[in-house]
Amino acid sequence: MRTEDSTGVPFAVAGSVNGGRKFIMEEMKNIADIKLELTLKIEEDFGLNSIHIARIDGFFNIVHARAGAPYRSQHISLKDILSKTQKDFCFERLRGTLVCVYYPDYMDGINASGWHMHFVSEDKKLGGHVFEASFDSAECLLQKMDRIEIQLPREAAFDTYSLKEASQDEIEEVELGKG
């Protein structure tokens, strides 16, 4: 999705999928099945101590997603912002791409460990953070990432704000769409 160059984001993970392992994922009834299949593939080929990115293209039976509206504040948690601005969506029977990023357990704190997924429709008009999805068959491209770059905010407020207030339960609520 395109935005103005001046549009900011509070947090983003970006990567290129050039190469890697390509395979077909057959019937995935829910997001737990998708995460399990991806985890098995990285255990087979790479091991679980690296970051991985997957691009899954196909026709999705259902995608439950959410997106938070823009919100300007330096001292409100993601959970609190989402409780005020989040919109939930249920997309049915559409083509699109599921982008999945895996962080190993030891990187918890830089990002929530495990799989984090976003969806964008083929026409780039629909999308969001995914907490449920299913498809009959889709093509997956899975790649190990060998580096990360972290850009920290330049604002003074960042240096004085307590960043470790979120509990594991709160992070799970946000990730799974329960918050």
Where are these regions (language model features)?
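Hydrophobic alpha-helical segments and helix pairs
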Residues: 1-42
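Long, positively charged binding patches that form subdomain-scale interaction surfaces
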Residues: 28, 32-110
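A generic structural signal for well-ordered coil/turn residues at beta-strand boundaries
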Residues: 50, 92-94, 111-113, 126, ...
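Short, solvent-exposed amphipathic alpha-helical segments in soluble enzyme
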Residues: 70-72, 115-116, 134-135
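Mature extracellular or lumenal effector domains of secreted proteins
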Residues: 96, 125-126, 174-177
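Histidine-centered divalent-metal-coordination microenvironment in nucleic-acid enzymes
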Residues: 112-120
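A hydrophobic, small-residue-rich beta->alpha segment in the mid-to-C-terminal subdomain
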Residues: 121-166
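Conserved catalytic alpha/beta cores of large enzymes that bind or transform nucleotide phosphates
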Residues: 163-179
